UniProtKB/Swiss-Prot annotation:
<feature type="disulfide bond">
    <location>
        <begin position="20"/>
        <end position="39"/>
    </location>
</feature>
<keyword id="KW-0929">Antimicrobial</keyword>
<comment type="similarity">
    <text>Belongs to the invertebrate defensin family. Type 1 subfamily.</text>
</comment>
<comment type="function">
    <text>Antibacterial protein. Strong activity against the Gram-positive bacteria M.luteus, B.megaterium and S.aureus. Reduced activity against Gram-positive bacterium B.subtilis and weak activity against Gram-negative bacterium X.japonicus. No detectable activity against the Gram-negative bacteria E.asbriae, E.coli, P.aeruginosa and S.marcescens.</text>
</comment>
<dbReference type="InterPro" id="IPR001542">
    <property type="entry name" value="Defensin_invertebrate/fungal"/>
</dbReference>
<dbReference type="GO" id="GO:0005615">
    <property type="term" value="C:extracellular space"/>
</dbReference>
<keyword id="KW-1015">Disulfide bond</keyword>
<feature type="disulfide bond">
    <location>
        <begin position="24"/>
        <end position="41"/>
    </location>
</feature>
<feature type="disulfide bond">
    <location>
        <begin position="3"/>
        <end position="34"/>
    </location>
</feature>
<dbReference type="GO" id="GO:0006959">
    <property type="term" value="P:humoral immune response"/>
</dbReference>
<keyword id="KW-0211">Defensin</keyword>
<protein>
    <recommendedName>
        <fullName>Defensin-B</fullName>
    </recommendedName>
</protein>
<dbReference type="InterPro" id="IPR036574">
    <property type="entry name" value="Scorpion_toxin-like_sf"/>
</dbReference>
<dbReference type="InterPro" id="IPR003614">
    <property type="entry name" value="Scorpion_toxin-like"/>
</dbReference>
<keyword id="KW-0391">Immunity</keyword>
<keyword id="KW-0044">Antibiotic</keyword>
<dbReference type="GO" id="GO:0042742">
    <property type="term" value="P:defense response to bacterium"/>
</dbReference>
Amino acid sequence: VTCDLLSFEAKGFAANHSICAAHCLVIGRKGGACQNGVCVCRN
């Protein structure tokens, strides 16, 4: 999942990071965040 496609911000909250984290949880990771436009999952 690329964060550029999901990037939008509302009232200072970057939704792309939470969408990335949710994506990582779905695939069995411990969450994640966007780094340079790419969703990076934690192990």
